[in-house]
């Protein structure tokens, strides 16, 4: 199947086998996640056998559940009747978790005790996740390690949501949610549901409450005594500008917790963006 698409103003002919989805906006990541999970599950598990599912778990839809080598799942409820459940290599589902597919817990990630997961949700590699999560995507090395609600949301890499952080995903009026778009330089309607869109390396303080359709840029440290604004620009420290030296120091601190460090390439990219 040939598809003519536009990338950075240039027409590109893309050849693909099967269904093709083009992501134009970040909120489409969670909107299309159910489709993506099903496609990925089918591709990744084709011709392979799951590791045995321990008998301590309560299982529905066993044919739609796949555990990679080293995955640990004990004393939890897994219901794959509405969508597949994939537990990656060396990932861990702690006791008392309740999971409804579609769901992917990627390599080395941890789902903490008593978590409640609704599809379609993806927890990226080496993330920590807890609380109530619904139709959300967390990219690698990010943490939502405590109670709180995350729904219809996208969290970038190396983010941290403090204990009790919660987002709204539906307006009290049940009307269309408007989200800030850098491309349009304006708020645009994205549908009835949208929670939090957070860029890489950003963090929230404990008990932060995000309004419906909040956009947080990269490298933000959010701690305010009120509801944060619906659009928080890149490199924000509280309500001020983050200094670049402090950004690198804080990112380095968080990366060391997971055995990593800030690379030269990361520093160059962040410095370029900081100076825009």
Label for each model-derived stretch:
Residues 113-114, 120, 126-276:
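Glycine-rich hexapeptide-repeat left-handed beta-helix
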Residues 48-156, 171-172, 197, 215:
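Extended beta-solenoid/beta-helix repeat architectures
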Residues 1-64, 70, 225-276:
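Terminal amphipathic alpha-helical/low-complexity segments used for targeting or macromolecular assembly
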């Amino acid at each position: 199947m040939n598809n003519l698409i536009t990338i950075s103003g240039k027409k590109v002919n893309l050849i693909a086998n099967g269904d093709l989805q083009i992501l134009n906006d970040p909120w489409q990541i969670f909107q299309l996640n159910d489709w993506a999970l099903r496609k990925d599950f089918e591709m990744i598990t084709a011709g392979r056998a799951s590791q045995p599912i321990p008998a301590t778990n309560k299982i529905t839809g066993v044919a739609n559940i796949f555990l990679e080598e080293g995955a640990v799942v004990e004393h939890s409820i897994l219901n794959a009747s509405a969508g597949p459940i994939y537990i990656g290599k060396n990932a861990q589902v702690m006791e008392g978790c309740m999971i409804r597919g579609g769901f992917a817990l990627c390599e080395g990630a941890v789902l903490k005790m008593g978590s409640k997961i609704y599809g379609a949700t993806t927890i990226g590699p080496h993330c920590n996740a807890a609380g109530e999560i619904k139709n959300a995507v967390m990219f690698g090395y990010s943490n939502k390690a405590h109670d709180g609600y995350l729904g219809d949301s996208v969290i970038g890499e190396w983010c941290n949501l403090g204990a009790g952080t919660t987002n709204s995903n539906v307006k009290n009026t049940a009307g269309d949610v408007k989200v800030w778009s850098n491309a349009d330089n304006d708020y645009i309607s994205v549908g009835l549901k949208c929670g939090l869109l957070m860029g890489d390396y950003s963090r929230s303080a404990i008990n932060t409450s995000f309004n419906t359709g909040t956009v947080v840029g990269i490298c933000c440290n959010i701690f305010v005594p009120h509801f944060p604004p619906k659009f928080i620009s890149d490199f924000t420290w509280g309500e001020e500008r983050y200094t670049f030296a402090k950004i690198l120091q804080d990112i380095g601190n968080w990366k060391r917790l997971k055995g990593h460090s800030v690379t030269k390439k990361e520093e160059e990219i962040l410095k370029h963006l900081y100076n825009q």
